[in-house]
Amino acid sequence: MKVTFEQLKAAFNRVLISRGVDNETADACAEMFARTTESGVYSHGVNRFPRFIQQLENGDIIPDAQPKRITSLGAIEQWDAQRSIGNLTAKKMMDRAIELAADHGIGLVALRNANHWMRGGSYGWQAAEKGYIGICWTNSIAVMPPWGAKECRIGTNPLIVAIPSTPITMVDMSMSMFSYGMLEVNRLAGRQLPVDGGFDDEGNLTKEPGVIEKNRRILPMGYWKGSGMSIVLDMIATLLSDGASVAEVTEDNSDEYGISQIFIAIEVDKLIDGPTRDAKLQRIMDYVTSAERADENQAIRLPGHEFTTLLAENRRNGITVDDSVWAKIQAL
């Protein structure tokens, strides 16, 4: 089915207010969920909203909490989210990293005691729109087996890197082949995954999203490489924030809350003039996309460039929402 941005935001806003969230906070949170969905990231927008409400009702998310600065070391700051709303706090933290970068050339904010930030790419994009390189990542509850294991002991720990090119170039990737959100998107659409995304119950690689969602044997991105990246990203976020690791979140909490996140902004224009920057970025993009295609009908893509097209299509034609997901939201 198709809905408008206004319908989507109104539905989110209604549910948030009915759960006791104040009007201003509800409006800002609903706006972010709707913008994420409008951008084509359904897995971490509309599809994720019922799960967000579940955590709100369980008390994992404290809607009136505000992040608090703990330590300041010039270009580096450490904050405590105090279990505030994840997407609103993440936006504030990237804004703060940008402010630090404006003064120091680079800004790093380490955040502890945070909640799920929904679409991580929003915060990298936020920096790139202002002309900064944006880098951020988060840890999570253990939802992926380390390479060579059957039991979940590491997080998918998504990493975002956004470059202020025209259009913005951005990698937004979990350390698994697919996020659990994308497994859900493919399952709801009745599709197999395009490549193997995990193991079945017999230990064979599989493209069946429902099987992987159930047994939690999701495949690390690049096999042992994604497993290793997940571990070191967790270590850095834990140390810099003085927050909880994947092990602590998993063993000490009843659900995924109190996690650790990193936000970095780099002011490129302190290092290179604008025309030179633009020319170098354009040459990189042209060089990559001019490679001979393996399939003449399949264009060579640059990461993140599809979001400009998706946003325009959704604004023109309406936003696609799965019927069952919309029914869940209407019933909340």
From Swiss-Prot:
GO terms for cellular component: cytoplasm. One of its GO terms (molecular function) is NAD+ binding. Keywords: Cytoplasm, NAD, Oxidoreductase. Its EC number is 1.1.1.130. Pfam families: Ldh_2 (PF02615). The active site is at H44 (proton donor). It catalyses: 3-dehydro-L-gulonate + NAD(+) = 2,3-dioxo-L-gulonate + NADH + H(+); 3-dehydro-L-gulonate + NADP(+) = 2,3-dioxo-L-gulonate + NADPH + H(+). NAD(+) binds at I168, T169, M170, V171, D172, M173, S174, W224, K225, G304, H305, E306. It comes from the Bacteria. Homodimer. This is 2,3-diketo-L-gulonate reductase. It comes from Escherichia coli O1:K1 / APEC. The gene is dlgD.
